[in-house]
Amino acid sequence: MVDAIVATFADDALVNDAHREFWGIEAIRRWAARELAGDRVTIAVTEVLDHHGDTIVRGRYDGNYDKTNLPDELILTNYFSIRDGKIVTLMVIRNTPASY
């Protein structure tokens, strides 16, 4: 599973997940092994949008990760930038609705 995930990223890609940066393919491999495969994360996609060539994917996350202070239904937004068929940037963000 980890090899398949990592194969979608460029060698110098950036992942930002929970305000942490993972630069380069080896850091992304460690992130995917520990936090996706290791925590058995599943994502049920709820929305996919194209925004000026970038892809935005919203989904319900579940898995064996620490859910302390998280809502029962965790929706995260994933912002993908893709160049030459590879992910160059992935930002994983827990958004909240604007109050105005």
What is the meaning of each model-derived region?
Residues R29-Y100:
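A beta-strand edge to alpha-helix "cap/lid" segment located at domain peripheries
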Residues D12-W23, R34:
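A short gly/proline-enriched turn/hairpin at secondary-structure junctions
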Residues A4, A27-R30:
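Alpha-helical elements of Rossmann-like donor-binding domains used by nucleotide-donor carbohydrate transfer enzymes
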Residues M1-D12:
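Short, well-ordered alpha-helical segments enriched in acidic and aromatic residues
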